[in-house]
Amino acid sequence: MIAARLNMRFPSERVKAVTLSYDDQSEQDITLIDILNKNGMKATFNISTGLYSYEGKQFKEGAVCRRVTRKRAIELYKDSGHEVAVHGFSHPYLTQMPSSSVAREVFADRLNLEADFETDVRGMAYPFGDYSYSEEVANALRATGIVYSRMTSATRKFRLPSDWLKWNPTCKHTDEKLMELAEKFVADATNKEPMLFYLWGHSFEFEADDNWEVIEKFCEYMGNREDIWYATNIEIYDYVQAYQRLIWTADMKRVYNPSAIPVSFQYHTIEDSGEIKQTYTVCSGETLVLTQRLNT
C-alpha cells in the first residue's frame, strides 16, 4: 500500500492567501478601499447598522470616527468586491447580555445588511473584540447563522483557525512587527501547509495617527502578487469548507468534489523511491482519479 497525505492549496494551486478586516463603517473606509483596489486586495467590512450616521449630521471638530450614513454605506460597499459582515446592531459588549439579546443584536444586524446589500451575510467581527467572546455568545451566533467571527488577539502566525468562531488575526496594522511579518510571509518558500496573513484594524486610526503610509506600504508590498490569493473572510471560510467536503475513496486514489467551487490540493505519496508530490484541482461536481505513480 502507498502511504498518502494531503495539503490544501488555495485557488489556482496557491499556498498563500491574504485577507483584511476593518470595523465600524467610518468615512476613512473610502480611502482604504481605494488603496486595496489599487493593489488587488480584498477586505471584509464589519458594520453596526444601528450606528449609521443620519443624513446631514455635523461631526464635532476633531472627531475621527465619522460613521457613514446608510445611503453612503450602500454606495461604498455594495458590489465593491469586498464583503460586509455583522458587528452587532448597536456594537454592544455581547458578554454583558443574555443569550436572547445577543441573538437579537446579531440577527437584526444581519437582516439589515442582507436587505441593503442584497447578499447573504454569514460573517462577523466581535464588537470590542475578545471582550465579547464566550461559549454562550458563540452558541447564540451559531443559532443566528453566523459561521465565523473575528477576535482581536494577534497570533503573529499564518495559520487557518481551528475554531471559526474564535478566528484570531495575524496582527493589527498598529503592530510594530507588521512589515517584518509581511516580509517573512512573502519570503517563506516551504510550500507545505497553507498560509494565511490576516490583518485587521479601524480605518479611522490612520487619520487619528496620521499614518496612512502604514497601510499604503503594506498593500504595495503585499499586493498584486501572482502567488497570493486575495480573498474576503467569507471566501476563505467557504473555500476551506469546500476542501473539507471532498469525498475520498478508502485508497485515496479517487476524489469527488460535491461543492460549487473548484478545490486544489497537494497530494503526497511515500514510495520506495522516496516522497512524490503532485498538485491537483478537482472541479465542481467532478470525480478525479489520481494516478498511482505521480510525476515530480
Protein language model annotation of sequence segments:
Residues 26, 172-189:
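A Trp-anchored, charged/polar loop motif used as the substrate-binding/catalytic surface
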Residues 66-71, 106, 178-184, 212-218:
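Well-ordered, non-membrane alpha-helical segments in soluble/globular domains
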Residues 37-137, 143-147, 152-171, 195-203:
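Metal-dependent polysaccharide deacetylase catalytic core of the NodB/CE4 family, i.e.
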Residues 1-28:
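Boundary/entry segment of secreted carbohydrate-active catalytic domains
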Residues 22-25, 88, 203, 233:
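Active-site metal-binding loops of divalent metal-dependent hydrolases
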Residues 276-296:
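Intrinsically disordered, low-complexity Pro/Gly/Ser/Thr-rich segments with frequent PxxP/GP/PP motifs
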Residues 2-12, 114, 148-159, 183-186, ...:
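C-terminal domain-boundary segment and adjacent tail
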Residues 7, 31-35, 136-140, 214-218:
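A short acidic, amphipathic alpha-helical/loop segment
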